[in-house]
Amino acid sequence: MIGAEHITGVVLAGGRGSRMGGVDKGLQPYRGIPLALHALMRLQPQVGTTMINANRNLAAYESFGVPVWPDTDPDFAGPLSGFLVGLERAETPFVVTVPCDTPDFPDDLVARLAHALEAEDAELAMVRAPDSADAPGAPRPQPVFCLLRSTLLESLVRFVHAGGRKIDRWTAQHRCAMVDFDAAPFFNANTLDELRRLETQRV
């Protein structure tokens, strides 16, 4: 059994926020607190230690009380940059990533990913859930919700340094367990309008 104390949680807040007009998405208010802090508070009970991957307004993120690390890849590899930061900085055998813009992810997310990874002797485990853009019941991978063995660091460094940017192309090189979830907890806010709508739809 993979205990929570063996897992480092990483909140991914290093994106450019282009679909939100360039604002720092993780600092946008959701139910009165910043999105990234909401994600952090939801993640902390599920793991042993946490950190945030951010590239702007670092002092604001540091005020949340956990380590904040910017991307080490100057070419901006997207979410994989956050994966890389987590694997480089973690002192645990496992790392789990969650994006800052999906504030209502399940409170048993990490436990279910860990169970599947161990049961299938996989190198990583990720969420699979229906997407709002798909037909009802059509699940697809949600790769930013991912539990990884820390031993994958060398593989990811090679992939990113070779110009790789797509998560699915990297994960396809490894044994990956898919864990099915309902769609609702994974609704994310890509625009400010979607964020306001999410606030009114969730109780």
Swiss-Prot record:
SS bonds (residue pairs): none
Pfam family, one: NTP_transf_3
Lineage: Bacteria, Pseudomonadati, Pseudomonadota, Betaproteobacteria, Burkholderiales
Stated name of the protein: Molybdenum cofactor guanylyltransferase
Domain observations: The N-terminal domain determines nucleotide recognition and specific binding, while the C-terminal domain determines the specific binding to the target protein.
Alphabetically ordered keywords of this record: Cytoplasm, GTP-binding, Magnesium, Metal-binding, Molybdenum cofactor biosynthesis, Nucleotide-binding, Transferase
Organism per entry: Methylibium petroleiphilum (strain ATCC BAA-1232 / LMG 22953 / PM1)
Binding-site residues for Mg(2+), renumbered to this chain: D101
Record-listed E.C. numbers: 2.7.7.77
Family designation: Belongs to the MobA family.
Localization per Swiss-Prot or TrEMBL: Cytoplasm
GO cellular component labels: cytoplasm
Cofactor: Mg(2+)
UniProt catalytic activity: Mo-molybdopterin + GTP + H(+) = Mo-molybdopterin guanine dinucleotide + diphosphate
Subunit field text: Monomer.
SUPFAM superfamilies reported for this sequence: Nucleotide-diphospho-sugar transferases
Listed CDD domains: MobA
Role this protein plays: Transfers a GMP moiety from GTP to Mo-molybdopterin (Mo-MPT) cofactor (Moco or molybdenum cofactor) to form Mo-molybdopterin guanine dinucleotide (Mo-MGD) cofactor.
Highest taxon of source: Bacteria
GO molecular function: GTP binding; metal ion binding; molybdenum cofactor guanylyltransferase activity
GO biological process, one term: bis(molybdopterin guanine dinucleotide)molybdenum biosynthetic process
